[in-house]
Amino acid sequence: ITGIYTNLEYDDGNGMQMIFLDTPGIHKPKNKLGAAINETALNTAGGVDVVLLIVDGTKKFGKGDQYILDMLSQSETKKVLAINKMDLIGPEAYLELYNKYDESGLFDEIFGISALQDTNVDRLMKCLSNYMIEGPMYYPEDMATDHPERFIVSEIIREKLLQYLDQEVPHGVFVEIESYDEKPRITE
C-alpha cells in the first residue's frame, strides 16, 4: 500500500511530499509465499531514501524482532525506528526497548511516538524529511493513498482476521467484499 503525505507549508511554502511504501511484514518464512513476502520487503528497502520500522511498544522484544533486525542489516539504506504506543507504556518499558534496538547499531535515529495521541509524530516526520532526496510531487496534494477505499477496507478486515485468529489462519488470506456502501466521510 502506498501512503502519501503532503505538507505544502514545509520549507517556507515550497512544500514536500513523502511517499510511504507499506511492505509486507518481515517474518521467518514457513513456505514459498512467506519467502516471497520477505524478498518483496527487502527489495523495497533497497530502493527507498530511508527505511522506517514501526514497532509496537506494548510488545516485548523477541526472536521475531531479532530476525527482522538480521534481515534489515542486509540493507545499506538509512534506517529510522519508531517505537509506537508510548501512551500505553511507562518509561522503563520504553527504555528497555530503546536499548535493545539501539544495541543493534542499525538505526540512525530512534523515536518514541504515539500515533493515536500524535506524540512526537511531527518530530519523526521532520527527521524522515531530512533523509529525502529532493524531487517532484508525484501525486495531487489531497491524495492520501493510491488505492481505492474498498481495497483499504478489505485490507483492514484481513489484518483483523490475522490479528485475532493468530495461528489459526495462514498468511494467504484473501478478503472479497461482496457488498459495499460508500458513505460521505465524517473524518479523514
Name each model feature, range by range.
Residues 5, 9-21, 35-111, 164, ...:
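Conserved C-terminal guanine-recognition region of P-loop GTPase G domains, centered on the G4
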Residues 1-2, 29:
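Conserved substrate/cofactor phosphate-moiety recognition/catalytic segment
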Residues 26-34:
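Flexible beta-alpha connector loops of hexameric P-loop NTPases
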Residues 142-188:
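Long, well-ordered amphipathic alpha-helical subdomains in the mid-to-C-terminal portions
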Residues 77-80, 86-151:
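Canonical P-loop GTPase G-domain recognition
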